């Protein structure tokens, strides 16, 4: 199999320590082959209503993927294609990548606010 056929999507995530973290993302780093799926976890312990997932591509600013204003309410951001989210409670806001593509190689951020 040639190296050209084996495309990988690399995910690099900011990660805060477990003590007084505020927002925690896991896993910290992840590499996927094209077509693989995975879930990025985002947990916050500040009882914030607003949670957002962003991606930052090389040389670009942040672009919002999906966001939520409260548990059970989610909406699409600027670049939602290829991603799904859910929010069943205030604390958790996982981002699901259904089928990795090289164009999704990026740094991913989860953020919370009031």
From Swiss-Prot:
Residues 1-21 form the signal peptide. It is found in: Cell membrane. Keywords: Adaptive immunity, Cell membrane, Disulfide bond, Glycoprotein, Immunity, Immunoglobulin domain, Membrane, Receptor, Signal, T cell receptor. It comes from the Eukaryota. Glycans are attached at residue 84. GO terms for biological process: adaptive immune response; cell surface receptor signaling pathway. Disulfide bonds join 42-110. Alpha-beta TR is a heterodimer composed of an alpha and beta chain; disulfide-linked. The alpha-beta TR is associated with the transmembrane signaling CD3 coreceptor proteins to form the TR-CD3 (TcR or TCR). The assembly of alpha-beta TR heterodimers with CD3 occurs in the endoplasmic reticulum where a single alpha-beta TR heterodimer associates with one CD3D-CD3E heterodimer, one CD3G-CD3E heterodimer and one CD247 homodimer forming a stable octameric structure. CD3D-CD3E and CD3G-CD3E heterodimers preferentially associate with TR alpha and TR beta chains, respectively. This is T cell receptor beta variable 6-9. It comes from Homo sapiens (Human). The lineage of its organism: Eukaryota, Metazoa, Chordata, Craniata, Vertebrata.
